[in-house]
C-alpha cells in the first residue's frame, strides 16, 4: 500500500510539473510589458469585448469608437476568435460540430454565399486604460491577425485599414489615446472579398470531392479550407472565419522603435565547428516633426560574451534596416557553436539575441528573440530523384505529417502544447503547414523549436482553387509572415502552394527576406511526388509498393496520405445524439467523417457484407 501511494504521488507530481512547465512556456511567449487585450469570454482575459452586426447600427465609426458609447444591446464577443464562434457562444446558432447542425441543408446556420457578406460584417469593441508609465512615450497598437479586412478606430479616429488574413499591423496611437483614462477601440471586420460557394467548379479539374467549392475562395489571401474540404466539412464554415482571429496588444517605446530582428547563421563545413552570424533589425522613427534622430543600437547574444553596437541617424518617418555582419564585427564569428538538432538527432540548443536602441543614452526600445544555429539543406541526388533532407550535414529520414488547423480557429495555447507534445511522442519530426490552412502562432513555432519538430511552410494557394486576385496584398501577407517566423530553427522549408504554382516574385521575396532555407514552387514537384493513399489498405501493399494506384510510394517523398480513425465512444457522444451512434446513422456519420470520404461508413458496410452484421 505504501509503495502504491508513493507511486501515485510521483505520477501526480509529474503531471503537475508538466502542466506547470506548459504554463510557464505560455507565459514566456508573451511580453509582460505589453497590455494584452484578450476577452473575458473564453480566454479569461481582462477585457470586455462586445460585438454587433454592422447593418444593425446606423452610427458612424467616429461615434462607435468613443468611450461613452452605449453597448448594452451588444453581444459578448470572443477575441481572439471569429464572428461565428461568438454567435455560437451567445446561443444564436447551435454548435456546428454536433450532428448535422452545420450541414448547409439543415439551414440552421446561414452560409455567407447565400446571405451575403453584410450578414457577417461586424463591429467589435472594447475599452482600455493606458497606464501612467506610458506617459511621454510612443504608444503602439499591434494587431496580429484579422480575417479579412478591417477598419481600426480609436477614440473617434480611423487610424488604419487592414487587408488580408496574415498581416501584422503596428499603429502609432500616441496622439489619439488618453493616459490614465478610458479609451475606446472599435474594429469593423469585413469577411473575405469573395466567399465562394460549396457548388462544384465549372472550370478545370474538379478535384477529389469538390475540394474548395467553386474555387473562388482562392481569390482571397485567407484560410482556403473554410469553404469546405474533404477532411473537414465539405460545405465549409458558414462565416468563412470572419473575425479578429489573433491577438491585439498595446505597448510603449521611446522616440524610436525596433522591429523584426533577424539573425542568419552560416556554418563552416565539413565540420560545422564555426558559425558566422549576421544580425539585422528595423529601426523606426515615427516622428513627422523632427529633422532626424541620432541613435545607437546595441546587441548581445545573451550569456556568450558577444556584444556589438552601431550608431547612425534616422530621419523623420524613416524605417531603417540596420545590419551587423561578421566581417564588420568579428565577435559574431562563433567557434564550436552548440548546434540545434531535430528530435532524436541531438539536443535542441537555443540562444537568445537581445537588441536595444537608445537616444542620448536613454533606452527607447528593446527586442529579444531566440534562435538556433543549424543548417538545413536538401537535394534530389537519389536513384529516383526523390528529395532528401540534411540537418548539419547529416541525412535525416523524414517522418512527417500534414498539420491542419482547427476549422473554426478555436485555438488555445493549452491545446497547441498538448497537440505538439503528442506529435513528438508519436515519432513525427516534420510538420507540413498545408497550403489551404494558416500560418501558425508564435507559440506554436516556439514549441517546435523546443521539441525539435521541423516545419514546412506553405503560402495559401492550392490547385483546387483560383489564385489571389490582388498580388500586392498576397505578397504583403507573405512578407509579414516570413518576418514573423524566420528566426525559428524549426522552420525548415518554404513551399509556395499545395499542388499548384507560385505567385510571380515569391522566390525572390523569400530570398530577400530570408535566404537561409530551401524553396520549391508547389508540394508535388522537385523530388516530391503526389499524395495518397487516403484510405486503409493491407499493410503489405506498402511494402510491395502497391498501396496507391498513383504509383510508387515507398522509394519516394510523399507529401500527404491518410486513413480514417475512430475517436473514443466518449468523444463520439460529444459529436452526436446517442440514437445516431448505433445503429450507425449514415447521414450523421458521413457528415462528420471527413465528409468527402465516408470511409467509416463505407468500411462498416464492406465488413458487414463480408462477415455479416454484428450480434
Which residue stretches match the model-derived regions?
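Substrate-binding/catalytic cleft of secreted carbohydrate-active enzymes
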Residues: 430-603, 607-610
Amino acid at each position: 500500500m505504501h509503495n502504491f501511494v508513493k507511486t501515485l504521488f510521483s505520477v501526480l507530481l509529474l503531471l503537475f510539473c508538466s502542466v506547470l512547465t506548459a504554463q510557464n512556456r505560455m507565459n514566456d511567449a508573451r511580453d509582460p510589458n505589453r497590455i494584452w487585450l484578450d476577452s473575458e469570454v473564453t480566454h479569461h482575459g481582462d477585457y470586455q469585448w462586445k460585438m454587433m452586426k454592422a447593418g444593425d447600427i446606423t452610427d458612424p465609426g467616429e461615434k462607435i469608437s468613443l468611450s461613452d458609447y452605449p453597448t448594452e444591446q451588444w453581444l459578448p464577443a470572443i477575441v481572439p476568435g471569429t464572428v461565428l464562434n461568438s454567435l455560437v457562444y451567445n446561443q444564436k446558432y447551435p454548435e456546428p460540430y454536433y450532428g448535422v447542425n452545420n450541414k448547409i441543408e439543415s439551414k440552421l446556420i446561414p452560409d455567407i454565399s447565400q446571405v451575403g457578406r453584410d450578414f457577417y460584417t461586424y463591429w467589435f469593441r472594447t475599452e482600455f486604460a493606458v497606464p501612467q508609465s506610458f506617459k511621454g512615450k510612443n504608444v503602439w497598437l499591434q494587431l496580429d491577425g484579422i480575417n479579412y479586412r478591417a477598419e481600426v478606430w480609436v477614440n473617434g479616429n480611423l487610424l488604419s485599414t487592414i487587408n488580408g488574413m496574415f498581416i501584422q499591423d503596428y499603429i502609432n496611437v500616441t496622439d489619439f489615446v488618453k493616459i490614465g483614462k478610458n479609451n475606446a477601440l472599435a474594429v469593423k471586420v469585413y469577411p473575405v472579398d469573395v466567399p465562394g460557394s460549396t457548388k462544384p467548379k465549372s472550370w478545370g479539374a474538379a478535384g477529389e470531392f469538390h475540394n474548395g467549392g467553386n474555387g473562388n475562395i482562392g481569390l482571397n489571401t485567407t484560410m482556403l479550407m473554410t469553404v469546405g474540404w474533404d477532411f473537414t466539412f465539405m460545405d465549409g464554415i458558414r462565416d468563412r472565419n470572419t473575425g479578429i482571429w489573433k491577438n491585439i496588444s498595446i505597448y510603449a517605446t521611446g522616440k524610436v522603435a525596433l522591429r523584426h530582428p533577424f539573425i542568419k547563421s552560416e556554418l563552416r563545413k565539413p565540420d560545422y565547428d564555426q558559425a558566422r552570424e549576421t544580425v539585422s533589425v528595423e529601426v523606426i522613427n515615427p516622428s513627422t516633426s523632427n529633422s532626424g534622430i541620432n541613435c545607437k543600437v546595441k546587441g548581445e547574444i545573451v550569456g556568450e560574451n558577444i556584444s556589438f553596437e552601431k550608431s547612425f541617424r534616422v530621419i523623420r518617418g524613416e524605417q531603417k534596416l540596420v545590419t551587423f555582419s561578421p566581417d564588420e564585427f568579428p565577435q559574431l564569428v562563433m567557434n564550436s557553436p552548440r548546434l540545434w538538432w531535430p528530435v532524436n538527432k541531438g539536443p535542441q540548443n537555443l540562444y537568445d539575441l537581445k537588441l536595444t536602441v537608445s537616444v542620448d543614452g536613454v533606452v527607447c526600445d528593446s527586442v529579444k528573440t531566440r534562435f538556433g544555429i543549424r543548417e538545413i539543406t536538401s537535394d534530389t541526388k537519389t536513384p529516383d530523384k526523390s528529395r532528401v533532407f540534411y540537418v548539419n550535414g547529416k541525412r535525416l529520414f523524414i517522418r512527417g505529417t500534414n498539420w491542419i488547423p482547427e476549422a473554426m480557429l478555436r485555438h488555445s495555447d493549452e491545446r497547441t502544447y498538448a497537440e505538439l507534445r503528442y506529435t513528438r511522442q508519436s515519432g513525427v519530426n516534420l510538420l507540413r503547414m498545408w497550403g489551404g490552412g494558416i500560418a501558425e502562432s508564435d507559440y506554436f513555432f516556439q514549441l517546435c523549436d523546443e521539441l525539435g519538430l521541423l516545419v514546412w511552410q506553405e503560402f495559401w494557394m492550392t490547385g483546387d482553387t483560383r489564385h489571389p486576385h490582388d498580388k500586392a496584398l498576397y505578397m504583403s501577407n507573405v512578407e509579414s509572415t516570413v518576418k514573423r517566423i524566420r528566426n525559428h530553427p524549426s522552420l525548415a522549408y518554404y513551399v509556395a502552394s499545395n499542388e499548384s504554382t507560385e505567385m510571380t516574385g515569391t522566390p525572390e521575396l523569400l530570398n530577400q527576406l530570408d535566404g537561409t532555407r530551401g524553396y520549391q514552387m508547389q508540394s508535388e514537384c522537385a523530388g516530391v511526388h503526389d499524395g495518397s493513399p487516403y484510405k486503409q489498405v493491407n499493410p503489405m501493399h506498402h511494402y510491395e509498393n502497391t498501396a496507391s494506384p498513383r504509383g510508387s510510394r515507398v522509394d519516394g517523398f510523399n507529401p500527404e496520405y491518410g486513413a480514417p480513425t475512430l475517436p473514443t465512444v466518449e468523444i463520439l457522444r460529444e459529436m452526436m445524439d446517442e440514437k445516431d451512434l448505433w445503429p450507425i446513422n449514415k447521414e450523421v456519420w458521413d457528415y462528420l467523417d471527413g465528409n468527402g470520404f465516408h470511409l467509416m461508413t463505407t468500411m462498416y458496410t464492406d465488413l458487414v457484407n463480408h462477415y455479416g452484421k454484428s450480434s
